[in-house]
């Protein structure tokens, strides 16, 4: 837990603590709370600035100091159990359900347990414990390795090259980018930080050794530039039929214009022409390449080759 989070937890517990220990001395309070006298003074000054909306003197948390003792005179309700409003509970449930369905971000069982408790506390109709989504053994192994700081061996499918490789990595953290979970890890083979998408990790197993990514890699902020528009990458102009419009939510696509028939023209960046060709073949006639011509020709050639192979394999 970060220092900021630790202080927040301490501040939230200080008012109930002082109410349970009226007229406790500063020295005793500092010792029991595990802080210095200076930190206790800073915490009390911070609490003095917290309270109910309006934030006038009568709305803020207040203390009475008698000699060296401390007593709460107005708690601003911070001593009462937290109660969520209906919109707050609904928003929290929606967020938890979304997180529970994304591999690797949270423990699915813990998330579903929290969902059931919040739904019951909020008075949801027929609140029942929801079954946690099935987590793949690979995702569970990766999450455990991150939690335990253990090195991993993974079998990873690289969509851009259509290959399955085995790699040894030192996990750093799990990231959520564009609705997908990624393992950020130090690749010993590449000697650099790499991102591995959870749904492309075919198998994973902890090694009997600690994860030892370089300290510079561990401390550096996540590099998500791959998911930003990179002007150095080639771009294709595509015409997307309404039936394939869902692809706009899953790929680095910028919509150019809507057409009268409901289709749209888009610009899509890509790093590998091989990968782009395979992707477009999967959409059939729903996605047509308008530019560049080299990519359009490559897709046509690949489609013709596939059709010829199919006809050759067909029984006479």
From Swiss-Prot:
Part of the pafABC operon, but PafC does not seem to be involved in pupylation or substrate degradation. Appears to play at least a small role in resistance to reactive nitrogen intermediates (RNI) in vitro. Disruption phenotype: Cells lacking this gene are not severely sensitized to RNI and display no accumulation of the proteasome substrates Mpa, FabD and PanB. Interacts with PafB; with which it probably forms a heterocomplex. It comes from Mycobacterium tuberculosis (strain ATCC 25618 / H37Rv). Belongs to the PafC family. The lineage of its organism: Bacteria, Bacillati, Actinomycetota, Actinomycetes, Mycobacteriales. This is Protein PafC. GO terms for cellular component: peptidoglycan-based cell wall. PANTHER family: PROTEIN PAFC, PTHR34580. It holds the Pfam family WYL. Residues 131-211 form the WYL domain. InterPro entries: CBASS_pafABC_assoc_protein, PafC, PafC_HTH, WYL_dom.
């Amino acid at each position: 837990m970060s220092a900021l989070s630790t202080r927040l937890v301490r501040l939230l517990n200080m008012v109930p603590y002082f109410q349970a220990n009226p007229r406790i001395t500063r020295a005793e309070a500092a010792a029991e709370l595990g802080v210095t006298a200076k930190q206790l003074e800073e915490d009390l000054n911070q609490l003095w600035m917290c309270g109910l909306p309006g934030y006038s003197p009568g709305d803020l948390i207040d203390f009475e100091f008698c000699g060296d003792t401390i007593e709460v005179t107005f708690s601003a309700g911070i001593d009462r159990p937290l109660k969520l409003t209906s919109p707050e509970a609904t928003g929290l449930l929606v967020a938890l359900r979304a997180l529970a369905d994304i591999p690797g971000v949270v423990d699915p069982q813990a998330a579903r347990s929290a969902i059931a408790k919040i739904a019951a506390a909020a008075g949801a109709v027929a609140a029942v414990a929801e079954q946690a989504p099935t987590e793949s053994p690979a995702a569970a192994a990766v999450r455990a390795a991150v939690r335990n700081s253990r090195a991993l061996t993974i079998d990873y499918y690289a969509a851009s090259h259509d290959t399955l490789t085995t790699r040894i990595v030192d996990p750093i953290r799990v990231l959520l980018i564009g609705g997908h979970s990624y393992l950020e890890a130090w690749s010993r083979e590449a000697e650099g930080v790499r991102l591995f998408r959870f749904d492309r990790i075919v198998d994973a197993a902890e090694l009997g050794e600690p994860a030892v990514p370089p300290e510079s890699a561990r401390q550096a902020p996540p590099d998500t530039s791959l998911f930003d528009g990179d002007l150095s990458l080639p771009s294709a102009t595509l015409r997307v039929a309404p039936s394939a419009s869902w692809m706009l939510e899953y790929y680095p696509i910028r919509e150019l214009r809507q057409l009268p028939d409901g289709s749209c023209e888009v610009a899509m960046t890509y790093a590998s022409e091989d990968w782009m060709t395979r992707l477009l073949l999967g959409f059939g006639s729903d996605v047509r390449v308008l530019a560049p011509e080299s990519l359009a020709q490559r897709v046509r050639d690949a489609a013709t080759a596939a059709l010829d192979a199919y006809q050759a394999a067909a029984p006479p």
